[in-house]
Amino acid sequence: QVMLADSKKRAQEIRSRLYQLLGVAQQITFGEAAKIATWVGGQTGVRPALLLAVLTKESKLGVNVGLCNRPGDPENKSWRKVMKASRDHEPFLAITKSLGMNPDITPVSCPMYDKQGNKIGFGGALGPAQFIPSTWMGYTSKISAFTGKTPANPWDIRDAFIATALYLKNKGVASGGANAEWRAVLSFFAGSPDSTYRFYADNVLAIARGYEDDLKTLGL
């Protein structure tokens, strides 16, 4: 009886824990996020714990997430400056227009910088899954096919989970166990399985192992 009570208490603690995501209108509990991830995983074949881990990692990358293009930000933080113009300006305008959002005050990610202060690539990623606008546009119809909702919204938690799962599946995540997951996660971060960024994939898989235990406790 004591063990059963402890198990139920542990499950309730996990279920009610806040699942921290940046770039969403409201916080959700881990229990709610776990249900979404389990549903998406069942539809796509991508491990739910891995989905939870990727979105956790994306929203905890730190200072670059959603801290550009906010109301009151200086011009050098505007979407016109932080995005790659030829690739992402037009898709960003299309996404915000379809959702009735003002592109000039819709938060996007800032570029990353190395230890010497040199800019690495571009900013402009959207929502909790941190898709760049041009990549998101390639998944909108696929996401809507799952949800029955148009247009797909990168700031919607369910849409973000689905987009992440579809991207990982496209990168072969379900083809061969842990190594396939590692390579797919690396591609999610770097665009290709570049081992320079192995720290990212290593960290995501470590987070996923913890979430696997949590999901078992919840019976998911």
Features from the language model and the residues they span:
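Catalytic glycan-binding domains that act on GlcNAc-containing polysaccharides
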Residues: 19-220
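Amphipathic alpha-helical coiled-coil segments
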Residues: 1-7, 11-14, 18-21
